[in-house]
Amino acid sequence: MKKFYYILAIGLLMFGMNFQAKSQTRKYVSNFSHFQSYFNPGLTGYEGSAVRGFVRNQWSGIEGAPRSYFVSAELDFGELSGEMDPALMGKNALSVNMLQDTYGAFRETELIVSYASRVRLTEKHNLRLGAGVSYQNIRLDGNALTSEDLNDPTLGQYLGGFSDMQVVDFNIGLALTHSKYYLSYGMHRVGGGAIISGDEFIDSYPASSIIQGGYREALSPNVALIFNAYYRTQKDVNDNFELNLKTLLMDRFWLGVGTRVNNATNLQMGILTKRLRIGYLFEFPVGGDYNLPGNTHEFTAVFNLFRDNTRRTDNEVLIW
């Protein structure tokens, strides 16, 4: 009986993945606070100039489960010009982001180039505005189609072959930032996938809205608390609401816990060196649509190009 439920769960997983692929897949990133500029171009350069990356193996142990690779580079022109406090005094930043996501018969490669500009509102507040151009190439492997795919009149015609689809669109975002907190709103695919070339095997490409916010506080010289929240809504999939809480100890390592409401819980840890921070996250299902066998592993790395991971003031917190 257990074997029967296991096989049934895998079948439901593959069906759910393929159903979403015909419209637009959702890419989960549980360490979302380390990759703010990918979700909102207005937050480009918020943590200074850095190279970032992650590897995410979702539902490990299940064939065809999502697997994601990400790398980005952010450049804050305020740091280049030698500003004493570039996060506050700087005005412009640029980023290049690349994400590759594999799920079942689909492999998606996304490239985003973003630019952000800042307007100083008060002594400690900035209003950040950003825009980005995204290019996506989605490749369909007809040799990896499932039985559900073959019953679909659009996907079934690609059995045994390969097909590619390209989409060009735009992202926008704005954010209110402070050294201790931020609140932002971003939108991906503003044009709704209006610029498409190649074979159109995805039947809809709706825009998605993303709200992010966070607060951090140094409780003592050796302890800091960091809280982040993330909400994403899109027409053809369920809303996604995530929360993360971390404790940074001695400015050298952190421990945390997070949740994707009604879906999954995660445990996280990481270390900071002079310029580098490395994190690991273990996620397990707790209910909802994806309460299926298999857990998720996520590895992250951030390398500061110009700034060391040391406090400039007593109440500064080094990570989000």
Task: Give each language-model segment a name.
Residues 24-320:
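Subset of outer-membrane beta-barrel
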Residues 17-23:
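Sec/Tat signal peptide C-region and signal peptidase I cleavage site
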Residues 1-8:
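Bacterial N-terminal signal peptides that target proteins for export
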Residues 8-16:
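Bacterial N-terminal signal peptides
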